[in-house]
């Protein structure tokens, strides 16, 4: 029994460690890459969030003869959240505006991935900005959930 618990804890630690190193939140989507990206754009527009660009990486790769599974990136931002975060630690600006990657894995599963705000908090040694980090976490999770499910 102790051995089983130890193995389970070791596996859990490894998963948590890999998640922390990765710095990404990955949310499965029931829709295609294009439809998921369309849904994200629609949600952002409804919320009045600025969309700076939508990059179809797989399309660009195809233009130079490289086959790439569907991969799109949406770059967006809201100065009401980003500016207070930069005021706490200006170096976080290198990771802003926010980005959401919508991609298809080797098993044809579609994912929404974005930078974990807690990872950015650690990366930039952000202190005294808990309320802003929580708002960003909630906003990104809400967008991903709404875009990925019925």
Which residues does each PLM region occupy?
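Terminal, regulation- and interaction-focused segments at domain boundaries
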Residues: 13-51, 55
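Positively charged n-region of N-terminal signal peptides that target proteins for export
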Residues: 1-4
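Sec-dependent N-terminal signal peptides
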Residues: 6-10
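Stable alpha-helical elements in mature extracytoplasmic
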Residues: 36, 40, 57, 132, ...
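Compact, glycine-rich, soluble single-domain proteins
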Residues: 41, 45, 52, 56-98, ...
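Beta-strand/loop substructures that line and gate deep hydrophobic ligand-binding cavities in soluble
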Residues: 99-126
